[in-house]
Swiss-Prot record:
Its cofactor is Mn(2+). Belongs to the metallo-dependent hydrolases superfamily. Adenine deaminase family. The lineage of its organism: Bacteria, Pseudomonadati, Pseudomonadota, Gammaproteobacteria, Enterobacterales. Disulfide bonds: none annotated. GO terms for molecular function: adenine deaminase activity. NCBIfam families: ade, PRK10027.1. Its EC number is 3.5.4.2. It comes from Escherichia coli O1:K1 / APEC. Homodimer. This is Adenine deaminase. The keyword Ion transport does not apply.
Length: 588
């Protein structure tokens, strides 16, 4: 917990202090006063009655003593409950397929006033230029968009081909940027545990900031060693006792509920009055359809309250104050004097019904955000340009030879989880012994001219057709799954033609596709348009079989070697438990 770095983020001049204090004392006129409001007390529980007084970006006072205070403008909350703006403790905005500007437009009106973002998706594709663009977006955003400096680009050295490197020298150039809060998820946990100097150099360089972790399922001495290296949190926990042990050992626990990785139900029972300061909420990866139809952090709070009976003040605490304290953002997370006026007014606190949002002391208007989106995106100078350096493919590129009677490794998908299982399947002249086996291939897209890496996939639910995408964590090569080589080739060629994107093929034809012109990861369309296109893609994908709820996000993690158990990268089949490549055929 890095309270010592608060000065980096809390910029207030002496003049601003004097003006704020004058309003607090009652000697000057406030900019805004919110009347007819109850403030949820995140520290003691219960509510505080009375107005909220705002001067500039900050709260000057709270409580009944300001009932008659003067203000330039008054906001009638109409009996609403006020809570601090919501904070997402860990996410990759690129996974929403929205630009940071569009993401803000989609989520700020839902109360998400702050995000802690790791832009390692775009950094894996285009290196420092991608990070620089995210920093430009953060500088101009109304939303508080903070960045963790991507630590593992690529995710695991020597295991995949990606588009760029991000050296320690480049990382250090961003360390003191005002929007940078620390070092992003250290995914190479075996390297940290074994004391690899290159990784310890990165940890040492950012040790005065927040050091993010990534250690799914880790326990025992290995977990102790990982924490001893200075890692402060983890968002990858998926089992109750795993989360409990991490809390016991001093880690902060990020409870994740994304579009593919859904860990809230497993971990929510851990949250209580005692440990809630060490618990945070995050989405990691959430697509625009879910944001539009279900929400973002607001959806997670709602579920904590309605499904897990978490007390109101605790649910909102883990959605704001706990995260602010963890990242040293001491000007955020509470509705109290001197704190930044990031305020969410709720007409129903139990249902998390957002009535109005203020950020940095100013009311947010959703229509204004939408109207300004195009100009603000252009102002950020997005890094356009085709990042697909791959020639079209043919069905013969996916040809695999199988021997009857032999056993082959199959990546077994677990719906709504990022981990996979490794299982075997026996081939005969009639095919494999289980009819859920389909084909998967990964094609590097950065000009290395490698042949496709091919494998077998089970449990995905694909009965016909093919799905292809350039969103494929973390190197973002082209991943394709299918029942026939011909349809796999058709899907791959469509995303190559689009300059990156998503595609569904069935009955020998492209049924739906979505171009992603920025790094093959993001669209420049509006959030509403993007949600509609995702809806069409999902509808087309559902015609291919009983797929996961979010088939493209689930598919995107089948190439990430730092999450067990069996994955496929552009280099081949990777055992995520042994951290070594393995063979498709079992050798006795």
């Amino acid at each position: 917990m890095n309270n010592s770095i608060n000065h980096k983020f809390h910029h207030i001049s002496r003049t601003e202090y004097q003006e704020l204090l004058a309003v607090s004392r009652g000697d000057a006129v406030a900019d805004y006063i919110i009347d007819n409001v109850s403030i949820l007390d995140l520290i003691n529980g219960g509510e505080i009655s009375g107005p909220i007084v705002i001067k500039g970006r900050y709260i000057a006072g709270v409580g009944a003593e300001y009932a008659d205070a003067p203000a330039l403008q008054r906001i009638d909350a109409r009996g609403a409950t006020a809570v601090p703006g919501f904070i997402d403790a860990h996410l990759h905005i690129e996974s929403s397929m929205m630009t940071p500007v569009t993401f803000e437009t989609a989520t700020l009106p839902r109360g998400l006033t702050t995000v802690i973002c790791d832009p390692h998706e775009i950094v894996n594709v285009m290196g420092e230029a991608g990070f620089a663009w995210f920093a430009r977006c953060a500088e101009q955003a109304r939303q508080n968009q903070y960045l963790q400096v991507s630590s593992c680009v690529p995710a695991l050295e020597g295991c995949d081909v990606n588009g760029a490197s991000f050296t320690l020298e480049q990382m250090l150039a961003w360390r003191d940027h005002p929007q940078v809060t620390g070092l992003a998820e250290m995914m190479d946990y075996p390297g940290v545990i074994s004391g690899q100097n290159a990784l310890l150099d990165k940890l040492d360089a950012f040790r005065h900031l927040t050091l993010d972790g990534h250690c799914p399922g880790l326990g025992g001495k290995e977990l102790n060693a990982y924490i001893a290296a200075g890692i402060e949190n983890c968002h990858e926990s998926y089992q109750l006792e795993e989360g409990r042990r991490k809390l016991q050992l001093g880690m902060s626990l990020m409870i994740r509920e994304g579009s593919a990785a859904r860990n809230l139900n497993a971990l929510a029972p851990l949250i209580n009055e005692f440990n809630s300061p060490q618990c945070m909420l995050c989405t990691d990866d959430r697509n625009p359809w879910e944001i539009a139809h279900e929400g973002h952090i607001d959806a997670l709070i709602r579920r904590l309250i309605e499904q897990h009976n978490v007390p109101l003040h605790v649910a909102y605490r883990v959605a704001s104050w706990s995260t602010a304290r963890h990242f040293g953002l001491n000007h955020l997370g509470l509705l109290a004097p001197g704190k930044q006026a990031d305020i969410v007014l709720l007409s129903d606190a139990r249902k998390v019904t957002v009535q109005q949002v203020l950020v940095k002391g100013e009311p947010i208007d959703a229509q204004t955000l939408q109207a300004e989106e195009s100009a603000r995106l252009a102002q950020s100078a997005p890094p356009y340009g085709n990042t697909i350096d791959r020639q079209p493919v043919s069905a013969s590129d996916f040809a695999l030879q199988f021997t009857p009677g032999k056993r082959y490794r199959v990546i077994e998908v677990i719906h709504n989880e990022l981990i996979t299982h490794s299982r075997s399947s026996v081939y005969s002249e009639n095919g494999f012994d289980r009819d859920d086996v389909c084909f998967i291939a990964v094609l590097e897209r950065y000009g290395q001219r490698l042949a496709p890496a091919c494998g077998l996939l089970g449990g995905f639910g694909l009965n016909e057709g093919a799905l292809a995408a350039t969103v494929s964590h973390d190197s973002h090569n082209i991943v394709v799954i299918g029942r026939s080589a011909e349809e796999m080739a058709l899907a791959v060629n469509q995303v190559i033609q689009d300059g990156g994107g998503l595609c569904v093929v069935r009955n020998g034809q492209v049924q739906s596709h979505l171009p992603l012109p920025i790094a093959g990861l993001m669209s420049t369309d509006t959030a509403q348009s993007l949600a509609e296109q995702i809806d069409a893609l999902k509808a087309a994908a559902r015609e291919c079989g009983p797929l996961p709820d979010e088939p493209f996000i689930q598919m995107a993690f089948l190439s990430l070697p730092v999450i067990p158990a069996l994955k496929l990268t552009s280099q081949g089949l990777f055992d995520g438990e042994k951290f070594a490549f393995t063979t498709l055929e079992f050798t006795e």
